[in-house]
């Protein structure tokens, strides 16, 4: 089996990323153009996992404009064939390692029914010996009646020296 490579995304990856997200319910599918923009403007904080030249994982993340010490993880997707191999965790570790020393927190939003993502985030915090906090952020009234509320998860402070040890 070929090795999995983690790297920054290229604009040419956007189509494959869009398809990967579309195939990863319950993630919200966004336009292809949005993924082009992420690959172009946020490549320093987004990560692609590649196997045999195929995109099999993607993490979209950015440094929060209101909290420059925080990496906000927006979406994480892994191809069904490659799940439960630690790829999602490595995507987040890779994104964190691309940031400067001032980033000490990870934030993400998660719906109450997305128990897999919630468990992943709790385990991620445990792996880094970091605090895990969760609170309501956006209500379904704001997001629309067909969308569950989104809770904000905050993990940290993160000691960057632990990234190499736990990866």
List PLM regions with ranges:
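Conserved beta-strand in the GNAT
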Residues: 48, 54-63, 70-72, 77
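C-terminal "cap" of GNAT-fold acetyltransferases
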Residues: 128-167
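A short beta-loop-alpha structural element at the N-terminal edge
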Residues: 4-17
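Conserved active-site alpha-helix within GNAT-family acetyltransferase domains
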Residues: 112-134
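A short, aromatic/hydrophobic, helix- or strand-capping loop or linear motif
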Residues: 28-37
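Conserved acetyl-CoA-binding loop-helix of GNAT-fold acetyltransferases
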Residues: 78, 84-97, 119, 123
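Conserved GNAT acetyl-CoA-binding A-motif
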Residues: 99-112
């Amino acid at each position: 089996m070929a090795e999995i490579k983690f790297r920054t995304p290229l604009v040419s990856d956007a189509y494959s990323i869009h398809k990967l997200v579309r195939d990863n319910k319950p993630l919200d599918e966004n336009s292809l153009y949005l993924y082009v923009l992420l690959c172009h403007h946020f490549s320093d904080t987004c990560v692609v996992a590649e196997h045999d030249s195929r995109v099999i994982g993607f993490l979209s993340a950015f440094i929060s404009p209101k909290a420059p010490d925080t990496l906000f993880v927006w979406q994480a997707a892994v191809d069904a064939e490659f799940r439960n191999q630690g790829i999602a965790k490595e995507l987040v570790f890779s994104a964190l390692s691309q940031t400067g020393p001032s980033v000490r927190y990870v934030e993400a939003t998660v719906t109450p029914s997305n128990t897999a993502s919630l468990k992943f985030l709790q385990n991620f915090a445990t792996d880094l010996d970091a605090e895990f906090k969760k609170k309501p952020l956006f209500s379904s009234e704001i997001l629309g009646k067909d969308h569950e509320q989104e809770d904000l998860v905050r993990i940290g402070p993160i000691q960057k020296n632990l990234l190499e040890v736990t990866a």
